């Protein structure tokens, strides 16, 4: 399974490179991007209006001589990959030494994270991540304690470099206000440099009557809104969202634009 996953990942990355630098990412093509999921949605008109505004802005820029023909930044985009550094033997096999600096780098992804269940201070996942130069994410759920998270940050990032550590909160839609403020205050008190991110997916998993795991879209959205509200009140910034995606149109979440 690992060999198959590796092969599929390599193929996906090759496709991303082709799309991101072959002209498909050109903003002029915004009308041709995958719109199948939105066409029959009540939100279709809003999406179309946004497309039209982007097209109008690009037309104005073109009239000013700013276009993708002379500015590659308008037709290309950089992709950075990320995954959980869960399977340590696999991660070890993908770790390389920079011959110019002697530093270790994980080449399985640009950014790797430690899961909420594997962030033990004396665990192998923290030990591995503290030995590589990649930016590192740390999942923080309801069981996380501020002092514990600070210790992990200091262990992985002893120089307190900005941008090295991202704390990814995953408390669930009904627990953000209970846990996140304490975590933010604990980290700020110790002067630890972190980027704050929100994972509204993994804390909101429920089991349907058929036995399948699913999520309610409204719960996902509520966690995102609560996280932004807490950061605003604490004087910090939500620096990103951790969202699960799929290459196919599947119905995993209930609710949403079509109120499934």
Language model features with spans:
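Extended C-terminal subregions enriched in glycine
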Residues: 169-248
